[in-house]
Amino acid sequence: MAASSSSVSLLISCSFCLLSFLALSSALQTAASRRDGRSRISSLISQQLFDSFFLHKDDPACPANNFYTYASFLQASTSFPKFGNTGSQVRRRREVAAFLAQVSHETTGGWPTAPDGPFAWGLCFKEEVSPQSDYCDSTNKQWPCYPGRSYKGRGPIQLSNFNYGQAGKALGFDGLRNPEIVSNNSLVSFKTALWFWMTEQKPKPSCHKVMVGRYVRTRDDLAANRTVGFGMVTNIINGGLECGLPNDGRVNDRIGYFQRYANLFGVDTGPNLDCQYQKPFN
């Protein structure tokens, strides 16, 4: 027997209602997940604690004043649910402290006799000052440079080179055509830093995996004396310039920030803070 027109209409109506319900349910789950992500990170680091880390980031003397906000940091972290959410409470706090310490060094405005000390001036800059080049790798066919664009360091992690292309693809923006967005949009800026932190780029592991104790050293790591800890993270970020050197001031600055932040978090730093005896990753 053929279905009546009223039955067909009812079936279509019910199907539409079901699709609408599923779409609404998905949207609510996404919103809840984002709220959970914000509350997860905010339970580790409150606005007050965040501000105590970065005592001078909004000083008029800092070019990035009022750019790096606590709200943007929390919102960016929702895109990376494992950040600050892996392992014990100590490991979680230590990871967040390590991340903020590394980005503080990359954006520091401090000096040895600075007010409140040299490690209270993180997030002072949002882009590299007087870069030596436009950081274009003309041989890279996968991530080709766009004419007239500079791929100098920008954002908390000072994203540079072809990382603009990779980060843009992962986060949904055109990093090669519009690298300036990293220093113009606070949310995108923090997202690029967290993307770098969470993403493995072989032969380098992710900074996240190292700091939460989930990384198992390879044979090459053992041969290069790359020990797991904050020093290996420095090696991942800038080992070619800073590791394997005696008492490097840049490495010490990173460690100084980490020690201060870990203390404010009430956790220890863990072992292997420097990379003096480590060979850089290839």
Listing of model-derived features with the role each one plays in the protein:
Residues 28-282:
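Folded extracytoplasmic luminal domains of secretory or organellar precursors
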Residues 6-27:
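Cleavable N-terminal signal peptides of Sec/SRP-targeted secreted and luminal proteins
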